[in-house]
């Protein structure tokens, strides 16, 4: 792990820097170093935020999976933009990501869905995510029904369950420093295909 926060301010490659910070978090954070706060906005402009798990990232963007019929799924499909904030308290680091959102390919979604535990794949069918639930029993009944339905063979991916990729136009790295004189580096580009510009920010 890098001990000097000054080291990161020299970086010119945001995805490489993110990979290094995520690797540090995997060694330091006790639970879910890939947990991230995902912010969306509803049709009235009212923000929503919730924790999700980052499942993949590369130079094209940051990937997570969800039910497209959920509140966050519907808000993303409508606005086609989102933001993320990673906070690794043990490292006193934060990364903020903003950009347009695209659906992952069916092949990507199928591959990730197939890698999930069987119970999680059943749950994707049983849960009408974000909609009112009359009782815990109703959910458990749905789980039992789909468990019986898919007792033999593979469990197909629900048509409404897939992934999104945030294609960043802004990535900011923050490191805590004494007396709130933090280090901040912001990478921006006009489009997801553009070249990165880098600025150091006042804390």
From Swiss-Prot:
Record text on cofactor binding: Binds 1 FMN per subunit.
Binding annotation for FMN: 50-55, 65-66, 71-72, 94, 129-130, 174, 184
Catalysed reaction equations from the record: pyridoxamine 5'-phosphate + O2 + H2O = pyridoxal 5'-phosphate + H2O2 + NH4(+); pyridoxine 5'-phosphate + O2 = pyridoxal 5'-phosphate + H2O2
Keyword Flavoprotein recorded: yes
Record has Oxidoreductase as a keyword: yes
Pfam families per UniProt: PNP_phzG_C (PF10590), PNPOx_N (PF01243)
UniProt similarity note: Belongs to the pyridoxamine 5'-phosphate oxidase family.
Protein name, per record: Pyridoxine/pyridoxamine 5'-phosphate oxidase
Source organism: Brucella canis (strain ATCC 23365 / NCTC 10854 / RM-666)
